[in-house]
Amino acid sequence: MLPSHRTISRSVLWVCACLILEGLLHPCQSSAQNSLQQQVSLTISAAADLSLAFQELGTLFEKETGTKVIFNFGSTGQLAQQIEQGAPVDLFAAASIDFVDGLERQGLILPDTKALYARGRITLWTRADSPLRIERIEDLSRPEVKRIAIANPDHAPYGIAAREALQSVSVWEAIQSKLVLGENIRQTLLYAETGNVDVAIVALSLSRQGEGRWVLVPQELHKPIDQALAVIKGTRHEQETRRFAAFINGPEGRPIMRKYGFVLPGEESVK
């Protein structure tokens, strides 16, 4: 006997209901999975001398872990001030350990995460087409050198090192009228790249990747530029932030940092 019209209708309705229910359930399940797997993003406040190295590190870290890294590059002193004012930051990578120590005294970092990750060097940088031949820092007092850029020593560790080096060779006072101050070391280099100054005293990490000419400033002319990092207290992603901090000082990060001219913990600096 053939099934009745009513039986067929009920069967069709039952199948349709199952299909509708299946369609409703799967998006919910997918949405839940997406929510659970939502990508974590870390906000890293880092000194401007790290811009090239850390962008490469961040790309590799995201590829290996799936954690996105967003960088805020700037002057170490200004970044520290932002953190003091409550900026939502997960990790602070400073160009001087002094600023990390300052945040620690205020209870703003996780003390066990404070670590040195590099020692910086400064260089004398000129454009490749510059007629000037700058071989040593004393050359900056020559009359043909009209404008010199350094990072602002009021809040930039590389600017402090530049000032110390200039004072060590007794030309600091003589070049005051030539000085142009950059807000951070990246802006300082930009002044020279664009021809707004003749010479810039900038981080080796930036000089090595540029197209200009540069010479190292002897490290004995200034205090060591010991760079440190720390996880910020109150981070919402402590586990991932700790992992990125370890990544910088680990076997994945050290070769990248070394490539950009940083002296790493446990290694000796080039004279």
Predicted regions and their residues:
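Bacterial N-terminal signal peptides that target proteins for export
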Residues: 2-15
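Compositionally biased, low-complexity segments
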Residues: 5-7, 23-27, 31
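Intrinsically disordered/low-complexity terminal segments and short unstructured peptides
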Residues: 6, 19, 64-66
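Bacterial N-terminal signal peptides
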Residues: 14-26
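Exported/periplasmic ABC-transporter solute-binding proteins
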Residues: 28-66, 70-73, 77-87, 94-97, ...
